[in-house]
Regions:
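Hydrophobic transmembrane alpha-helices of multi-pass solute transporters/permeases
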Residues: 2-144, 151-599
């Protein structure tokens, strides 16, 4: 009989263990709302669908964005400075909308629904742009190439154009931070194999983004530069529609997370509760309030108490008044917060200085879509009888990203891990390397421009190829920017996704997108300030319509100097940063994958 009970006990334990292995440990659910079965959901099957979706959507987006500055000058009749500013503002708006998408995703809709809705808006914007360009904007027929400018446009046509491109901005912006996080959701951090796959996913995600833009920067770019704008826009619309269809096909396979509700009240509760206990002195951590350690499957991991921002700990300090309220079941979240709530606020406060330091890098990155293109347009773009569209030079940026992702993952990271006996470079260290490479890119661009001016043809306003210097001299600056992206943007995606609370993962990805957004706005502001200061006393300024009369090289050197100052501040902030500490489903299980301090 004892043997029978022993066997029965072992069988029960094995069944419990098997059930635990069958389901993910991170609280993911399937499309029916049931706990996600590890073998039937997520992993690379779902992630590959998301990567292909990202590639197609990026193709569609850059089919518009990469040549937008030329569309504004050739079709809409804007000068170089205005066109560069408008592209920076539009690109900035794309990523500002990422905050809206992240908020709706984390709070109410969930990542899957948010991705589907904003992708639909994206498709509508592209179709609208294609139709309006064909019917209204490209008149006379065949205009918009380098030789035949288009005529003027009435107000309603201009309004329709801007409505179309800002619908594209809304759709792509709201979708981008959520698709990155949704892809990461397909891997369970509680499983060592899937945890490693999740880290690798972000590199492949950025690679998919660049591979998608490769077609835009070559084939579509060539068509559009030759005046075939409508064909390019329709190809982008078709690619976006295919991306949406493919995304929906993966619905049965995806892993989902329920939205955690609006985080703003939770944050406000911490500040209000701390303010109510302003005169209280917190001496012992064990008096801080933490809810039941065993949390429901659909809630995020609890965060462990950290030092720093000690005044916020007062919100979780249990006073005698709180004890009495708890006994009477009258305790309010506005008078007592959990340690996890407090740590969520601390987490965001610690991230902000790092995030602010990434904005100036995005100013450098923004030059590829504007001033790099205008600089290339003023160089010799002919190879034998073949004309190279200036925007297609960003192909070297894409190839650089692909090469450096491989070099980093396969060579550099393992080498550093063996040499330093660690897990390789941290995200913060990689972002610092990205800033160094960005400085080198601006110095390279400035030197090329200085050399281009020496070869420039004096007083050449309209002639083709206003400098005899080959456009291929731009290759180093594109390659350096591409290398910097691998360290900065991939590092950002991993860092912000890993260091934000479980209920704010899309917000973490949106921080990366918003950095790009503000970088474009700062770029636009910087160009305006530089032109206002430099274009005085009848001087043409640093960035005039005819670059041969300006000093674009000085602007690049200015950016290099500003980025150097930003690097110094970044290093100080990274050393100050403290990594978050999560607690798993088992209260004794604490994540130890990150060091305590930043650098």
């Amino acid at each position: 009989m004892a043997c029978f009970h022993f066997l029965k006990k072992n069988t029960v334990e094995e069944n419990v263990k098997k059930e635990h292995q069958d389901y993910t440990s991170d609280g993911a659910i399937d499309r029916h709302g049931h706990p996600a079965v590890r073998q039937k959901t997520g992993d690379w099957v779902a992630a590959i669908l998301i990567l292909v979706n990202q590639g197609l959507a990026t193709l569609a987006f850059f089919g518009v964005g990469v040549n937008l500055v030329l569309f504004l000058t050739r079709v809409m009749g804007q000068d170089n400075a205005d066109a560069a500013n408008n592209v920076s503002k539009w690109t900035g708006t794309v990523y500002i909308f990422s905050l809206l998408g992240a908020f709706l995703s984390d709070s109410y809709w969930g990542r899957y629904v948010t991705c589907a809705i904003f992708q639909l808006i994206f498709v509508i914007g592209l179709v609208s742009l294609s139709v309006s360009s064909y019917i209204f904007l490209l008149k006379p027929s065949g205009c918009g190439d380098k030789e035949l400018p288009c005529g003027s446009h009435p107000s309603y046509q201009t309004v329709l154009f801007y409505v179309s491109i800002y619908l594209i901005a809304l759709g792509n912006g709201g979708y981008q931070p959520n698709i990155a996080t949704f892809g990461a959701d397909q891997f369970d951090e509680g499983d060592p194999r899937e945890q490693h796959s999740k880290i690798v996913f972000f590199s492949y995600f950025y690679l998919a983004l660049n591979v998608g833009s490769l077609f835009s920067n070559t084939i579509l770019n060539y068509f559009e530069d030759d005046g075939l704008w409508t064909l390019g826009f329709w190809a982008s619309a078709g690619s976006a529609a295919l991306a949406l269809a493919l995304f929906l096909c993966g619905t049965p396979r995806y892993r989902y997370f329920k939205p955690s509700g609006n985080p703003l009240p939770r944050f406000c509760q911490v500040f209000v509760a701390a303010a109510r206990k302003w005169n209280v002195k917190v001496l012992q951590d064990d008096k801080l309030y933490q809810a039941d350690q065993q949390f429901p499957i659909n809630e995020g991991r609890k965060m462990l108490h950290t030092q720093g921002f000690r005044f916020l700990d007062k919100a979780a300090f249990i006073t005698s008044k709180n004890l009495k309220q708890m006994e009477e079941n009258k305790c309010s979240s506005w008078s007592l917060s959990t340690v996890t709530q407090v740590e969520e606020v601390k987490c965001i406060l610690r991230l902000l200085p790092i995030w602010l330091c990434t904005i100036l890098y995005s100013v450098v990155f923004a030059q590829m879509a504007s001033l790099f293109v205008e600089q290339g347009d003023a160089m010799d773009t002919k190879v034998s009888s073949f004309h190279i569209p200036p925007a297609s030079m960003s192909t070297f940026d894409i190839l650089s990203v692909a090469v450096f992702i491989f070099v980093y993952r396969r060579v550099l990271d393992p080498l550093v891990a063996r040499t330093m006996k660690s897990k390789g470079l941290t995200e913060l260290q990689r972002m610092g390397i990205g800033l160094v490479l960005a400085i080198m890119a601006m110095v390279s661009a400035g030197l090329v421009e200085h050399w281009r001016l020496k070869h420039a043809i004096e007083d050449c306003n309209e002639c083709e190829g206003s400098s005899s210097l080959s456009i291929f001299w731009q290759v180093p600056q594109y390659v350096l920017v591409g290398a910097s992206e691998v360290f900065m943007y991939v590092g950002q995606l991993e860092f912000f996704n890993g260091q934000t609370p479980d209920g704010l993962k899309s917000f973490g990805s949106a921080l990366c997108m918003t950095s790009i957004s503000l970088g474009n706005y700062v770029s636009s502001l910087l160009v305006a300030i530089v032109m206002k200061i430099s274009a005085r006393d009848e001087m043409p300024g640093w960035i005039p319509g005819n670059l041969n009369k300006g000093h674009l090289d000085r602007f690049y050197f200015l950016l290099a100097a500003l980025t150097t100052a930003d690097l110094v501040i970044y290093v100080a902030m990274a050393k100050w940063y403290k990594y978050v500490k999560f607690q798993g489903n088992n209260q004794n299980e604490i994540n130890k994958q990150d060091p305590e301090f930043g650098l």
